[in-house]
Regions:
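Alpha-helical structural modules in large enzymes and assemblies
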Residues: 1-552
Length: 552
């Protein structure tokens, strides 16, 4: 038996207490680390499905934007993402991607929800202000008529353009049918006809008919609304005029092309001939009456390959071959190629986003002035403005007098048609919109608004800050608070659509989305809306409305 002194017992007790404190501390730290690890694992386990849900919305949005079938998400995108992640970060991280729900039905539902969210955002933006509409009708691959409507409105200091809706039409598609569809949609959305400034359509009777057309129906509920005929469509109609001699050249040229292009054997033989002759092109282009720009491209290609075409037609004993040995015929072909190319350039300049009636009218007026100048030059035998014709006349001996007569008649008829479809209006009266600091009067403004315009033109603060404005609509919306009535008068001119370009462009997307392989697609409007809409979806809001479940 060992006997300890009082001092030794005191030291031993202190040592044991110290050891006990260390043990308790280590146990607490160990337990805390284990508990934190469990919490982290639980947190990761809980947040992973939520992230997978958000990812499924993002992928569905991209699929619709790319206008692809919904099955591509599960059959291609997900396997590709897993393969890339595995290669770069390993299987452990890549396995998390398998929890993203991307089945065909899931992607379809996500697109519908995203489209509905975009639709709600558009309605909220539009319903509180003035807006203009653009609408057109076309037939899809299943012969179903689709009415497509776009809206232009001001939001956050600038004009925006978005698809309002796309609806299938039944029956005869009369003006009453179009109005009932449009009016019903606006009532459901809570939009007021009193806020509709204008409607832009093509020139079909169902749209612009005075008695039973859409125009008559709309004016009965919105008498202040203005209707405009698509400027691009009017330009195409005005461009179709041709005097008999030139029309014969055009029709013969089309028949030449069809003789080669419509027969597969002839097409292959012509390609081989072009290769042997070292031509820059190996094929001709088809002409389509529906495609307005095709005439210029077809004739330009034929003119470039005229030697090859002449050789091919001669070998085939075609009756068309002798035309390509006629210098006057080729000269007329060269002129048609040049004038149609210039008309195509005008047509393309009228296309695009965020255009307005003022800028489009300026381009048409400029072309009309060019026609007048070209007619004067052609009368004097100067064809330098038509480069292909000018080069040909430099090389060949052609009866210029006969050619001048044909060209002058055509240019004069073009001028008449352009004046008919684009009557000289009061475009100059809107110079105050384009140049508010230099044009201080207008016949279009009341005396009171002219006084306000004088105040604005003298406001050097606004004049200095306006240099940073990107467009006319942004400038006039920026002065709405200080000069509300003048701003409204300007926006009443800038807000209306000048063409149905957006509808025509979106019909191309519709044909791509609802093709012969997806002709039974039932969510056409939703897919089309997501594909063309520029408004970002509120994915966080959509996710908050759902219970996150991982894919199994």
């Amino acid at each position: 038996m060992t006997v300890f002194s009082q001092g030794s017992l005191r030291d031993l007790k202190r040592h044991l207490q110290c050891l006990k404190s260390i043990v308790h501390l280590l146990a607490h730290v160990a337990y805390g680390c284990e508990n934190d690890g469990q919490k982290t694992a639980v947190h990761e386990q809980a947040t992973l499905p939520a992230k997978a849900l958000a990812a499924s919305y993002e992928v569905a949005h991209l699929v619709a934007k790319a206008q692809k079938p919904h099955t591509i998400a599960e059959s291609l995108i997900l396997p590709a993402a897993i393969a890339m992640t595995t290669a770069m970060h390993g299987e452990k991280i890549a396995s998390a991607l398998k929890q993203i729900p991307l089945s065909n039905d899931t992607v379809s539902k996500r697109i519908i929800e995203i489209a509905n969210d975009m639709k709600c955002q558009i309605i909220e933006r539009v319903k509180n202000g003035m807006f203009s509409l653009e609408l057109d009708e076309s037939t899809d691959v299943t012969s179903v008529a689709q009415l497509l409507v776009f809206v232009r409105y001001s939001y956050e200091g600038k004009l925006h353009e978005d698809m309002l809706f796309c609806s299938p039409m039944e029956g005869r598609c009369t003006g009453s049918d179009f109005f009932n569809c449009l009016n019903g949609w606006m009532e459901d959305a809570g939009l007021q006809w009193a806020n509709c400034l204008s409607i832009c359509t093509d020139g079909a009777a169902a749209m612009l008919g005075k008695n039973k057309g859409l125009k008559a129906k709309v004016l009965s509920v919105a008498p202040h609304a203005k209707f405009t005929h698509c400027i691009i469509h009017r330009e195409a109609l005005a461009s179709k005029t041709l005097e008999p001699e030139l029309n014969n050249v055009l029709q013969t040229a089309i028949q030449m092309v069809n003789f080669i292009k419509s027969r597969p054997l002839n097409t292959r033989l012509f390609t081989l001939l072009c290769q042997e002759m070292g031509s820059s092109h190996e094929s001709l282009l088809f002409h389509s009456e529906v495609r307005w720009l095709s005439r210029g491209k077809v004739l330009t290609r034929l003119l470039e390959l005229r030697s090859e075409v002449r050789t091919f037609l001669s070998d085939a004993n075609s009756a068309f071959a002798h035309h390509l040995t006629d210098s006057e015929w080729i000269a007329r072909l060269a002129y048609l190629s040049c004038i149609f190319d210039k008309l195509n350039m005008l047509n393309l300049s009228l296309q695009g986003l965020n255009t307005n009636i003022l800028t489009l009218s300026d381009k048409v007026n400029a072309f009309t002035k060019k026609l007048q100048r070209w007619a004067v030059r052609a009368e004097s035998g100067d064809f330098e403005m038509f480069s292909e014709l000018h080069d040909f006349l430099e090389e060949e001996d052609v009866n210029v007098n006969s050619l001048k007569a044909s060209i002058n008649v055509h240019l004069q008829s073009l001028l008449e048609k352009f004046h008919q479809y684009f009557p000289t209006g009061n475009v100059e009266n809107y110079d105050w919109i384009r140049q508010p600091f230099t044009s201080c009067s207008s016949n279009d403004l009341s005396s009171e608004l002219e006084d306000v315009l004088l105040e604005l033109s003298s406001d050097r603060t606004i004049q200095t800050s306006s240099k940073a404005s990107k467009s006319l609509d942004e400038f006039w919306l920026s002065v709405a608070q200080e000069y509300p009535r003048l701003s409204k008068a300007a926006m009443d001119i800038l807000t209306p659509f000048g063409s149905t370009y957006l509808c025509e462009k979106t019909f191309s997307s519709l044909a791509y989305i609802k093709n012969k392989y997806r002709c039974r697609l039932s969510t056409v409007e939703e897919n089309l809306r997501v594909a063309v809409c520029s408004i970002p979806p509120k994915i966080n809001l959509l996710c908050s409305r759902k219970q996150a479940h991982p894919s199994h």
